[in-house]
Each structure stands twice: as structure tokens, then as C-alpha cells.
Amino acid sequence: MDFDTITSISTPMGEGAIGIVRLSGPQAIEIGDILYKGKKKLSEVETHTINYGHIIDPETNETVEEVMVSVLRAPKTFTREDIIEINCHGGILTINRILELTMTYGARMAEPGEYTKRAFLNGRIDLSQAEAVMDFIRSKTDRASKVAMNQIEGRLSDLIKKQRQSILEILAQVEVNIDYPEYDDVEDATTDFLLEQSKRIKEEINQLLETGAQGKIMREGLSTVIVGRPNVGKSSMLNNLIQDNKAIVTEVAGTTRDVLEEYVNVRGVPLRLVDTAGIRDTEDIVEKIGVERSRKALSEADLILFVLNNNEPLTEDDQTLFEVIKNEDVIVIINKTDLEQRLDVSELREMIGDMPLIQTSMLKQEGIDELEIQIKDLFFGGEVQNQDMTYVSNSRHISLLKQARQSIQDAIDAAESGIPMDMVQIDLTRTWEILGEIIGESASDELIDQLFSQFCLGK
């Protein structure tokens, strides 16, 4: 596949130790030769080397920057094209000038994700691996990055390819049956083989889908909302869980006016932790906006930490808030146990039923371990699975696997009902195509463009 040469800045904009301008395509090294001056031309150096020299403006012969240039020749590169990477000092002015020079002499500004898209289109990686690159970049915990790396290395791709190959073998057997319908023994053998292999594939799909809940949490974090009346200790809880003073803590009710969000690793479980403004009726315009945002965060939560004040009886506001969240996954927390107990625990237990109940003192940092263990128990049965497992963490993959499972079940049902093999063949072919969408073998151009548009510029 022929492409033009693209260029972009591959490091974050702003001041820094280094900045990198990356070029990929058939003219990458040629453009480098025009701009670079060193002991040798870039076209003359060995591949996969780093070369010291200077970037020169060809029009003025002015030295623009002192650089180190990496030269990587196709096909042993990320895009399977010639690549050069110009490493210069960090700083907006210089790196932009180098970028402009590369475009002046023949390169085009890359679109978001275009390098990874070329890696996919040139057969370097498949679509699921390409998506995992973005998951890796966005990962917030070691476990999430490991899960993404496993997918980049092709763990999921290998499983999907094996399943598709098995379906092709079934289809080949079905073709024999269709071509020689007069042989009953061939039909019986085909049906037995089809059912055995199809049920095995369905079970493998089931096993992948069983990792979906954990995988999605690994990828996106468990959306955990801390909720309660003002001044019950929500911000103190956020600070204790992330072990940092990100939220302002005072004795003044309504201090938190907005939704605060942090990522934290709790015993191997990545939490997307959200501290909300206390939910109450208020005339304060700013606080009222915060309360509305809190309600929105509640509607999107995987887990709710409902915080109550040990030093106060249950209030009507507590009961009203509980009515909003009672059908969700909730851990109830009695905070401020270092103060005199005025909360009737038996009354609370009657209200919350068998929901998990933890007692804490955020001031004295008591009960935090019990809370972390309860979170882990609630979502992972007390044990987070091995990060080396093959997880399905992408919503698109989960949806396609569910479709594939239904399609192959349709094939099984049809075969067991004695429906003609040419009809069963339709369901099997559909399953093969759906699985192909996961790795990009049968994905539409529109889907591919949409997926890569979510990448950052320069990747």
C-alpha cells in the first residue's frame, strides 16, 4: 500500500528536556537529507542508528538546532515505512520551526493516530492491537498497562484467529456435505464435527466474556462515587484513599463545590474515585451546580460509597439520598468514629438491609484497610485475577463477542434441529465475520477511521 510522507510532533507541547519530530513514509529519509547536516547523509547511515548533527534551514543556511536523528528503515519499523525521528531541545519555538521545515520540503501533517493506522494498514498490527496501544497510553495503573501490553503482544488476536480458523475447518466440512448429499455417513460425521467444534468455540467465547467485567474495570477504572451530606468526611476519605491532600477539608459544610476526580490503585483494583459536593437543598448558586453534577456522577457510578456522620443521628436528607442509591452497588460508611456516637446503628441497619457497612475515622486513618478489602470483595470476590490472563476490556470487543456467541448458538440450534447444512453455513459464516471485526479483518473503513481519530496527534 502506497502512502505519502507524514510528519508531526510526538512529544507534549511546552518546555521540556527534549522534543521529537517524527516522519514516516517514502520521502522521510530524503527530507531528512535536505534538513540534516552531519558526518554522513541520513541516506548513507546504517538503519536503526542515532546520528548527531544539526538541522539547517536550506534557504538561509542558518543553523536551526543541534539534534540527534534516529534512522529506521522499512520494513522493521512501527509503520513498516521509513521513519526518522528528530530529537531536539524541548521548547515550542524550535520544535515548531523544525516541523514547518519538514512540511516545506514535502511532508504532510499527520492526522491523529495516523502512524498507528499505517501500522495496521501495512499489516504490522491488527485492529485489536492498535486499540490496545491507546489503552496502554491511557492506563492509570500498573495492572491496566500490563493488560494492555498483553493485547498489544497479540494474546487476544491469537485466540480470535484460532477461533476463526476452526470455523473455516467446520465450513470446509460443511461444503463436503453440501457437495455430496447422497452420503448419509458424511452428513452424520459433519453434524457431529460441527456440533463438537461449535460448542468448543462458544465455550471459549464465554470464557473471554467472563473476563469482560474485570477487564473493563482494568481499562477504565471502577467508577466510584463518594456521596453523603455536606461535612460528613467525603473529602477526607478521598484524601486518605489517594494518600494526598487534593480535596480541601474544613469544618464548613459545602466546602466542596464541584466534582473532584482522581485515579487510585486499591489493592490491585483501579478506582476512578469521584468526590462529590454534598447533596442537599441549597440556595447557593455555585453549590447548587455542584449538587447537580453530583447527581449526574451518581447515575454513572459502578460503586457508591455512602458516608454518614457517627456524631449525628440519621436525617431526612440521609434517608432521601439513600432512596436515590439503594438499588446500586453501595458500601455504607459510618465516619467520625473518633467522636461521640449519636447515630443509631440498628436504625441504620434496618434502612440499608444487608449492604456492607464499614466504620471509619478518617481523622485517625482507621477503617481504611477494611474499606479497601470490602471494595475488592464486592467486585472481585476478594481476589483480582492474574494480570497475565487474556482480558477483554474494550466495549466494542465485548459487544462483538456477544454477537458471535449468539450467532454460533444459532448454528448449533440449527444443526441439532436437522436444518439443511447450507442454512447452518450462513450462521457459521456470520460468526466468522463478526470475529473478524475484532481484529479488523472485516471492519468497515468508517469504523477504522473513527477508531483511529481517537488517538493523539503523533501516535
Curated annotation (Swiss-Prot):
Residues 221-380 form the TrmE-type G domain. (6S)-5-formyl-5,6,7,8-tetrahydrofolate binds at R22, E85, R124, K459. Keywords: Cytoplasm, GTP-binding, Hydrolase, Magnesium, Metal-binding, Nucleotide-binding, Potassium, tRNA processing. SUPFAM superfamilies: P-loop containing nucleoside triphosphate hydrolases, TrmE connector domain. Binds 1 potassium ion per subunit. One of its GO terms (biological process) is tRNA wobble uridine modification. Its main location: cytoplasm. Mg(2+) binds at S235, T256. GTP binds at residues 231-236, 250-256, 275-278. Its EC number is 3.6.-.-. Its cofactor is K(+). It is found in: Cytoplasm. GO terms for molecular function: GTP binding; GTPase activity; metal ion binding. It is an enzyme of class 3 (hydrolase). It comes from the Bacteria. This is tRNA modification GTPase MnmE.
